[in-house]
Amino acid sequence: MPELPEVETSRRGIEPHLVGNILHYAIVRNSKLRWPVSEKIKTLLDEPILSVKRRAKYLLIELNQGWIIVHLGMSGSVRILPEEQPEEKHDHIDLVFRDGKVLRYTDPRRFGAWLWCEDLATSSVLAHLGPEPLSAQFNAQYLYQQSKNKKIAIKPWLMDNKLVVGVGNIYANEALFSSGIMPDRKASSLTEQECDVLVNAIKTVLTRSIEQGGTTLKDFLQSDGKPGYFAQELFVYGRKDKACLICGHTIESIKQGQRSTFFCRHCQHGEITD
């Protein structure tokens, strides 16, 4: 699933091609995504693109009339292509621009979304989101205050968008490894010092992934069609039964909330004793 670094990589890739350009028209080949494609998108004609932003894992494309809100779902990606490029099986949406370029949305599993909103303040999908992880608002004091009396395990807690947005499974695993914190500890067990280390680890791993164009494990492609290269820098995610790159001990895995969690008993400390 594309997480925050992949969405931010996509935003940075498409922004120079969209902002200041004129959306000539939209082609919707398949409306059956996670939610039906908003009818308004199908009717857009000759609309200038004012900005391309990101909130959590949503791409926000600003036009005079409102906003296109894009979620990449489990397997979605957006690419900039020439208008004459033939569409393929899973190419569901094109935004065709006056300069002959196309923003093409590809989504094999169709769990993504293309929504329309006149005012972001009224958008139900953007309501109740926590702070951005790379913002000053997300800091050790905030995380420590939020952790008090929380009996939930740390890793699924970090993945709650009401706490902080965009820390998906890959990056939660990697940040906890970097912090030396076991993923099944209760959130309430975190000390102020551990919160400081953990916040810094989250910011570092997300920033590094963005610099590498995100993580491609299967479907994700950058806007130029290239994969993300952060997969080559993963310490624990997807490395069950392999040697830890730091200490040589075996990487183990458990299930937390139907998600795979990866850890090293030697480098991380906390609850797991089996």
From Swiss-Prot:
Segments crossing the lipid bilayer: none
Cofactor: Zn(2+)
PROSITE patterns: FPG_CAT (PS51068), ZF_FPG_1 (PS01242), ZF_FPG_2 (PS51066)
Active site: 2 (schiff-base intermediate with dna), 3 (proton donor), 57 (proton donor), 259 (proton donor)
Keywords for the protein's UniProt record, in alphabetical order: DNA damage, DNA repair, DNA-binding, Glycosidase, Hydrolase, Lyase, Metal-binding, Multifunctional enzyme, Zinc, Zinc-finger
Note accompanying the cofactor annotation: Binds 1 zinc ion per subunit.
Annotated catalysed reactions: Hydrolysis of DNA containing ring-opened 7-methylguanine residues, releasing 2,6-diamino-4-hydroxy-5-(N-methyl)formamidopyrimidine; 2'-deoxyribonucleotide-(2'-deoxyribose 5'-phosphate)-2'-deoxyribonucleotide-DNA = a 3'-end 2'-deoxyribonucleotide-(2,3-dehydro-2,3-deoxyribose 5'-phosphate)-DNA + a 5'-end 5'-phospho-2'-deoxyribonucleoside-DNA + H(+)
One GO molecular-function entry: class I DNA-(apurinic or apyrimidinic site) endonuclease activity
Binding, DNA: 90, 109, 150
GO biological process terms on file: base-excision repair
EC numbers for this chain: 3.2.2.23, 4.2.99.18
Iron-sulfur recorded as keyword: no
DNA damage recorded as keyword: yes
Top-level lineage group: Bacteria
Zinc finger (FPG-type): 235-269
Function summary: Involved in base excision repair of DNA damaged by oxidation or by mutagenic agents. Acts as a DNA glycosylase that recognizes and removes damaged bases. Has a preference for oxidized purines, such as 7,8-dihydro-8-oxoguanine (8-oxoG). Has AP (apurinic/apyrimidinic) lyase activity and introduces nicks in the DNA strand. Cleaves the DNA backbone by beta-delta elimination to generate a single-strand break at the site of the removed base with both 3'- and 5'-phosphates.
Subunit structure: Monomer.
HAMAP family given in the database record: Fapy_DNA_glycosyl
Protein name: Formamidopyrimidine-DNA glycosylase
